[in-house]
Regions:
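Generic C-terminus detector
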Residues: 282-305
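A structural signal for short hydrophobic beta-strand segments in well-ordered beta-sheet cores
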Residues: 24, 171-174, 267
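Conserved nucleotide-sugar donor-binding
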Residues: 217-229
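Short, surface-exposed amphipathic charged segments that create phosphate/polyanion-binding patches used
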Residues: 88-99, 165-170, 281-285
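Conserved core of the sugar-phosphate nucleotidyltransferase
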Residues: 128-217
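A C-terminal functional module that forms or caps the active site or interfaces directly
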Residues: 229-263
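Conserved N-terminal catalytic core of the sugar/cofactor nucleotidyltransferase
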Residues: 1-8, 32-119, 126-127, 131, ...
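Glycine-rich N-terminal loop/short-helix segment of MobA-like nucleotidyltransferase
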Residues: 2-29, 45
């Protein structure tokens, strides 16, 4: 069996969630957290390694809540995303407190990855179908010449909306099943008729709820890490003095690779509903959703019993 890894980005500070570490909030009937379901679905689909990207200061609590339990059923590795972990002679601006973004998070796992891998957010529930499709893509043989072949799980925007506040989504532009561009779209709100994005000037634009969006679930290769590292150096070199919030984002880098002809991204559409704990108010509805999935037999009571 070809080795494949699930890489979980769990280093976010959870600033929108309020008190507590949102990635570790129990949501399942037996106290499971969202990552339990993600790992369950990934292992069921054929993944056989899990890499947690976390902050070093959260390591002990993280292992207690989930890490040690998962290490009993599959291979586990840890990578630490630290704000001062920068290449070469780059140094962190003294007043920067914001993490460097999803690109930097994945780069933190470079030393523990030598196999094809899927990347997900720790606090997102993706459903079962996406793991099967991404895993099956990663174990296929792809042409070695030409652009690098990677994939993305595409979710319908209407299946990813939030009842309790605004969200950011990477809206995808697709031709013949290939991703041709990603537009990072901010301030998306659920409306009675669907969805809209609200601009700073007070105007709003209606969005197509059937359009596919990126939920940061990518199927990538070890070779991608080299490009990711080079891109981060270029990103740091291009930051204007005084900019302490600019982030190195995975969708933006992949967008650049597509336009330069360096990557071909296959979009694997999933019709599953996404949900996650973005805001404190989301927790009750997410708990109810997992209870229903359990009652309906999608998941057993007690995932790993």
């Amino acid at each position: 069996m070809k080795k494949t890894a699930l890489v979980i980005m769990a280093a976010g500070i959870g600033s929108r969630f309020g008190k507590g570490i949102k990635q570790l909030a129990p949501v399942g009937p037996k106290g499971e957290i969202i990552m339990d379901y993600s790992i369950h679905d990934a292992l069921e689909a054929g993944f056989n390694k899990v890499v947690f990207i976390i902050r070093k200061d959260l390591e002990d609590e993280f292992k207690k809540v989930i890490g040690d339990r998962i290490s009993n059923i599959t291979e586990v590795a840890y990578a630490f995303q630290e704000i001062d972990d920068l290449p070469g002679n780059f140094t962190k601006p003294a007043d920067r407190t914001k993490p460097w973004g999803t690109g930097h998070a994945v780069l933190a796992a470079k030393k523990v990855l030598s196999e094809p891998f899927a990347v997900i957010n720790a606090d997102d529930y993706y459903g079962k179908e996406a793991y099967v499709k991404v895993h099956d893509y990663l174990v296929q043989d792809h042409p070695q010449d030409g652009p690098m072949h990677i994939c993305m799980a595409g979710f319908r925007l209407g299946n990813t909306l939030n009842d309790n506040g605004s969200i950011t989504r990477g809206v995808c532009h697709i031709e013949d099943g290939k991703l041709v561009g990603v537009t990072e779209t901010h301030n998306i709100f659920k409306t009675a008729d669907g969805a809209e994005t609200r601009n700073d000037d007070g105007t709003a634009e209606t969005l197509d709820t059937k359009s596919l969006v990126s939920m940061n679930m990518w199927g990538l290769t070890p070779e991608f890490m080299e490009i990711l590292e080079k891109g981060f150096v270029e990103f740091l070199g291009g930051i204007k003095e005084g900019d302490i919030k600019k982030e190195y984002l995975l969708p933006e880098l992949i967008d650049q690779l597509i336009h330069s002809g360096k990557a071909a991204v296959d979009v694997l559409e999933t019709k599953d509903e996404w949900f996650g704990v973005t805001y404190q108010e989301d927790k009750a509805s997410v708990q109810a959703a997992f209870k229903k999935l359990t009652d309906d037999g999608v998941y057993p009571e007690g995932l790993y019993q």
